[in-house]
Amino acid sequence: MMISCKKLFVFRQLPAVRRCLAAAAFSTPRATSYRILSSAGSGSTRADAPQVRRLHTTRDLLAKDYYATLGVAKNANGKDIKKAYYQLAKKYHPDTNKEDPDAGRKFQEVSEAYEVLSDEQKRREYDTYGQTAENIGRQGGGFPGGGAGGFGPEGFSQSWQFRSSIDPEELFRKIFGEGNFRTNSFDDFADSKFGFGQAQEMVMDLTFAQAARGVNKDVNVNVVDQCPKCAGTKCEPGTKPGRCQYCNGTGFETVSTGPFVMRSTCRYCQGTRQHIKYPCSECEGKGRTVQRRKVTVPVPAGIENGQTVRMQVGSKELFVTFRVERSDYFRREGADVHTDAAISLAQAVLGGTVRVQGVYEDQWINVEPGTSSHHKIMLRGKGLKRVNAHGHGDHYVHVKITVPSAKKLDKKRLALIEAYAELEEDTPGQIHGIANRKDGSKQATAGASEEPGAGAAAKASAAAAGSGASKPGPGAEESEGKDQWTDNKKTKAKEGGGSGSGQGDGGGGGFISKIKSMFN
């Protein structure tokens, strides 16, 4: 059956035939040979090898299922397609997924799928032929499977693939605005020997005193500032920028996407309306560079470990996190501080005053008579300054009684302690070196007199003899032994036998006088 070329061209325009040809073109990859015969008037074929052209068809377009790329159904409306694109674009955007090396490729595929499916005409052509008319024309004319439109004059193979006419980044900005994503954080300044960008956060070490009282500390940080060479003009010194020829100085360009016409920022001058013929070599025509600056960081009084403050550095913000060193003296609980104060045994019994170190100045505290160990004294308003509120915290002083060691006491003090131990009442348990007598009294077991009740007197007499002091006579000791002393709870008469009745009155009188005589 012979069909002329003109009739064949008309025959190919029928929709049913076009669909069949398109289906045949996207069938299993194959290599088809075409034998070019001699003209009808020659009557015979050439004797040499026949001319053969091979056309390779592939499944590239079938592999790129744009509906599957966006994860939508084939009957999805424009709203669902846009929603799916927005979610996938955020997921695979290079600025938000820097760890995935394939993020850029996936973002490109998502953008391609959205550009086709969001346009009604391109979507209709894609549903019919598997590609758009724009790409068909880019491949050499003709629809898929139609004549020699799929291969060149010299005989070659080619695959059909989508070629976007709009940059994916530009498409994203057009749809969702300029402020959602910053595609390149270094677009408006150039890097330098100091780094690739401005410092956004840093950690500062502080002592406890610096954190408590506040301080101004100088640190060196990277900042983005005006280029020192071109003074922000972006041009080499001695030159000036000219008007952008691509947007005619308007700063905007018109982009046609099928039936829609969109006006966007000029991609050549980035909306500046100017064209820089001789850009500055220092800042690469960007007007700003990364520079090292000394910045004073005001540390607020009462700052805590791990807290972060925000401060303005140039045109950007710097977040400073403080790392406060632990103090060996102060213990912090929010705005309150706790310290320990050591007092002597005599101060604990008789009372007194002691000087303690404060947060801002030293403080004198009063120790009441009979203060026990670990007693807590509060100094109201003497703590740390509150950072997020008015006023100061409190300073709590924990009292600790310093007990002298028996090995470090001299004979006088040891004798006094042992004498007090013999007179002490309501002792929980037993004291080493002090024996309890049957009548309830106590007696020193080491170096004590054989007579009952003479332990304290013997201790005192030995200490007095060692220091050269005079020793009271026996008569005075006997008269002192006959004295009586009164307790708050009970009154007990002490009777001594001979020179060994040296208990005496514990609150005053003979025994106290005898003890004092050791130091006269």
From Swiss-Prot:
Residue span(s) of domain J: 65-130
Mapped CXXCXGXG motif repeat ranges? 227-234, 244-251, 266-273, 280-287
Q: Where are the transmembrane segments?
A: none
Query: Spans of biased composition, class Basic and acidic residues?
Result: 479-495
Omega-N-methylarginine modification sites? 30
> What tissues express this gene product?
Ubiquitously expressed throughout embryonic development. In larvae, expression is seen in sensory organs, gopplet cells, gonads, imaginal disks, proventriculus, fat body, hematopoietic organ, midgut, Malpighian tubules and ring gland.
**What is an example of a Pfam family matching this protein?**
DnaJ_CXXCXGXG
- Annotated effect of mutating residue 222 to I: In strain: Apxo
Keyword entries, A-Z = Acetylation, Chaperone, Cytoplasm, Developmental protein, Membrane, Metal-binding, Methylation, Mitochondrion, Mitochondrion outer membrane, Repeat, Transit peptide, Zinc, Zinc-finger
Where are the residues of the annotated region Disordered? 430-520
Q: Where is the transit peptide?
A: 1-62
**Superkingdom assignment:** Eukaryota
Subunit-level organization: Interacts with ptc (via C-terminal cytoplasmic region); the interaction is probably direct. Interacts with hh/hedgehog; the interaction is probably mediated by the hedgehog receptor ptc.
Please, what other remarks does the record include? Answer: In strains Harvich and Apxo, there are 2 identical genes which code for l(2)tid protein.
Q: What is this protein called?
A: DnaJ homolog l(2)tid, mitochondrial
